Structure formats: structure tokens, C-alpha cells
Amino acid sequence: SLAWELTNIGNSVGIFTNGSRVLGLGDIGVLASMPVMEGKAVLYDRFVGISATPVLIDTYDLDTFVETVVHVSKTFGGIHLEDIRVPDCYAIENALMERLKKPVMHDDQHGTATVTLAAIINACKLIGRDLHSSRLGQIGLGAAGSAIARLALAYGVGDVMVTDVSEAAKAPLVEAGATATDLATLLREADIVVATT
């Protein structure tokens, strides 16, 4: 539509949070999370020239959060989810991806996984290791750890081993092709180890 050509919609992202899982700080609430959201907006502007606007949604109710994002989504070309607790972040992301016809990214999953895989690829190049025949061990299967393991599988890492204090956290990754193991075995057998909380 002309709105994408004649307005800033196509060059904008809404950064949505409820402050329920801010890195290193935990559940600090929506207002206290604002400096982190403003920092993300600065990164978008400085590095890629995208206009990003923090949107603080003061609720832990998943339906209210999703409906709020849906109602204001026409304002933005993309949706960036930030610092939302597990498992709520998965449900919110899935609901928005089903309902919106625009990019939806959960930074704590996709952003972290992308930069982690990039670092691993570059490290392997520097030391002459073939990542596709290597064994990667992922310790911790929260939002970031699960996404790192999934992206490593999609990229074609030789074998992805996973472990977590929660046995239930391993099951979806085993379904996706990872090998569940214990911490001692992972540390002994993995060529590359990534640990997340």
C-alpha cells in the first residue's frame, strides 16, 4: 500500500516488552525496563538506520499483551519482542506470527542465537575447524539456549548435544534432531561448548 512508500512504516520497528525477564535483572517491571528498550532503539538507529520505538505493555496476561501488539501493529514494519519471561515469550511470539503479516522477532531467542552462531562460525574459521563435522554442546535451554541449539541444527552443525536442569526442556530439541545428554558427558565429548542461563 502507499502507506509503506509514503510514510516511515516500512523503516520502523516496535520494541515490545512487559519487563518480565530483563537480562541480568529478572522481573523488574515494565517501567524499569525502559532504558534497555531505549538502548535497543539506539542500536537499530545507529547500525542500520531503522526507526525503533519502545512500547511498554504493563501486563503479564498473554492475551492482553498479544491484543495490544496486534492493535498497534500497523504503526510498524516489524515487531521486536524483548525481555519477556519463558514460557510466555514462546506463546506471544507464536500468536503474533500467526496473526500478523510482518516480521516478528524475539530478540532473546533469535538475536542471541544469530550472534552466537556467527561467533562460532568465525572461531572455527580462525582455528581451521569444520563446523559441519563438529559436536556442539549447549548447556541451558531457556529462550536463548533453545534458539542457539535450533539454529545450530538448521545450519548443519555435525551434532548438537543439549543439557539442562529441566528434563522437559530437552524433549523439543531432541524432536528437532539434537542429542540429549548430561553435563559431564557434554563437557567431555563436545568440541564447542555454549552455556546460557
Regions found by a protein language model. Name each.
Residues 18, 83, 106-108, 164, ...:
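Acidic side chains
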Residues 23, 30-45, 100, 110-197:
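Glycine-rich phosphate/diphosphate-binding loop of Rossmann-like nucleotide-binding domains
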Residues 52-53, 105, 160, 181:
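A local structural micro-motif
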Residues 1-104:
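N-terminal ligand-binding/catalytic initiation module
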Residues 59-65, 86-89, 109-113, 168-169, ...:
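Short acidic loop-to-helix transition motifs that present clustered carboxylates
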